[in-house]
Structure formats: structure tokens, C-alpha cells
A protein has these predicted regions:
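Canonical Rossmann dinucleotide-binding motif of NAD(H)/NADP(H)-dependent dehydrogenases/reductases
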Residues: 2-34
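Conserved glycine-rich Rossmann-like NAD(P)H-binding loop of the short-chain dehydrogenase/reductase
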Residues: 29-45
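The beta1-alpha1 cofactor-binding region of Rossmann-like NAD(H)/NADP(H)-dependent oxidoreductases
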Residues: 40, 60-73
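A glycine-rich helix->loop->beta "capping" turn
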Residues: 53-56, 76-89, 95-97, 105
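Hydrophobic positions on the long internal alpha-helix
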Residues: 88, 123-127, 131, 175-176, ...
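Catalytic loop of short-chain dehydrogenase/reductase
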Residues: 93, 97-113, 132-184
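C-terminal helical subdomain
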Residues: 170, 185, 192-193, 200, ...
Length: 246
């Protein structure tokens, strides 16, 4: 099932949480992992930890909200590696902190979309030429079950009624679907992953799943063989419904 010829994977937001664990597991599998992070000190510390574990890791300065930063990261990967085999768009933020839609300001939505959607789009577009050079490029967009209209129709705690975050993840899923249609006929596969409510800084460590559990579906989608799906939305149990709740 795992592809043997993949060599280089770039993970955004890789200095902590799900991104760091995903990088670690791909590194254990033998990939060179490029740790995209906007904070240099944290990025280098993450690199140091993985290097001590025997993983071929490298910090790459990458702020997904800054086009110049993305361009420099693309140029670095192009110069030093020539192609990219796996792109994992993991960087994300949540600003609600329990606030309901009417309690948000427009700036909250703009800030959320800047990282979760616009940044993800720019990173994907920027690295696409290098992914095309791969023998089988894989893109995994770390979404959320909250990006499913179906899941949002279920009775949930009001703290999960997060307009900015949920909307941004729904937009990510549409990006996944539309890019998959554009990339039909190529060797690239792109999918969205729902890692579940995980114990990370994103939710002030209030989740109930470990980063190891969360990384499972991301790793699976990142290492799909040529018969794997593209344009889908998956969690550890399989397909996540886009909109219709049964």
C-alpha cells in the first residue's frame, strides 16, 4: 500500500501538534520531511528533535499568509530537491474561543480564512509545479469534520458552532474537490483529511484524540498508491459526508 519511491514531504505548521507528529511518522517511514513553520525558533527546535530521533528532517521557514515566504520556500525546495512528492497543508487557526457567530467581527473571519483557506490555496498553487515533477504527487489538506454540512446539522456543544473555522474548512473541502477535477489524468492525488477533535494548541488542548490517532488518516492519504481515491473527504472510518446527514 505504501509507495516505495516517495522521498520528500513538506508539512505546513509542522513545529507542533498534528503537523509535527505527521512529520515524525513520515520520517520514520524513510521520507525526507520538510518542516514548514513561520516561527524560526520553534521550527529549528522541531527539526532538532527529529534529527536526534534519526529522522532526515529540515526546517523550512514558511508563513502561509505571506506570498513572499511561500515563494522562497518553493524556490528552496526546487533548488535543493527538484521536486516534491507529498504536500500536507496542515497549518490552521481557530479564533472563536467559544464565541457564537453574532459575537464575531468581520476581522475574525478574514484572519481565519487568511490562514486556513487563502494560505492553503497559495501553498498548493505554489508547490504544484514541483508536485507535477514527482512520479506520484500527493496532497493532503487537513480539514475537519466541522467542515461537513452534514456534521454541522447534528446536535453538538455550542462551542463547536464556530462560523469562521467551520466555514474555512468547508471551503478547504471545495478546494480539494475542484483541484481534483483539474488534476484528473495526472499522477497527483488530492484529498481532505478529518483528524478528529485532537488535543492540540488549536483548541487549548481540550480535544480527546491524541496526535498519533489524528495523524493516521493523514499518513494514509499521503501514501496512497496509484489506485487510491482523489477528491475525497476522509476520516479514520472512511468517507465523511459532504452535506447530507443520514
Amino acid at each position: 500500500m505504501y509507495m516505495k519511491n516517495l522521498k520528500t514531504a513538506l508539512i505546513t505548521g509542522a513545529n507542533q501538534g498534528i503537523g509535527f507528529e505527521t512529520a515524525r511518522e513520515l520520517g520514520v517511514m524513510g521520507f525526507t520531511v520538510l518542516l514548514g513553520a513561520r516561527n524560526e525558533d520553534r521550527g529549528k527546535k522541531a527539526e532538532e528533535v527529529l534529527l536526534k530521533e534519526g529522522i532526515n528532517a529540515r526546517f523550512v521557514l514558511l508563513d502561509v499568509t505571506k506570498k513572499d515566504s511561500i515563494n522562497k520556500a518553493v524556490a528552496l525546495v526546487d533548488k535543493d530537491y527538484g521536486s516534491l512528492d507529498i504536500l500536507i497543508n496542515n497549518a490552521g487557526i481557530a479564533v472563536e474561543k467559544g464565541r457564537q457567530p453574532s459575537q464575531l467581527e468581520i476581522e475574525d473571519l478574514k484572519e481565519t480564512f487568511e490562514t486556513n483557506f487563502f494560505g492553503l490555496f497559495e501553498v498548493t498553487k505554489g508547490f504544484l509545479p514541483l508536485l507535477i515533477k514527482s512520479t506520484a504527487g500527493r496532497i493532503v489538506n487537513v480539514s475537519s469534520g466541522r467542515g461537513s454540512f452534514a456534521n454541522n446539522t447534528k446536535p453538538v456543544d455550542k462551542s463547536l458552532n464556530a462560523l469562521a473555522y467551520n466555514s474555512s474548512k468547508a471551503a478547504v473541502n471545495m478546494l480539494t474537490l475542484t483541484f481534483s477535477k483539474e488534476l484528473e489524468g495526472t499522477k497527483i492525488k488530492i484529498n481532505s483529511a478529518a483528524p478528529g477533535y485532537t488535543i492540540t494548541a488549536l483548541n487549548d488542548f481540550k480535544g480527546h484524540r491524541t496526535v498519533e490517532q489524528a495523524a493516521n488518516i493523514i499518513i494514509k492519504l499521503a501514501t496512497l498508491d496509484e489506485n487510491g481515491p482523489s477528491g475525497g473527504f476522509f476520516d479514520e472510518n472512511g468517507n465523511v459526508p459532504w452535506w447530507k446527514y443520514k
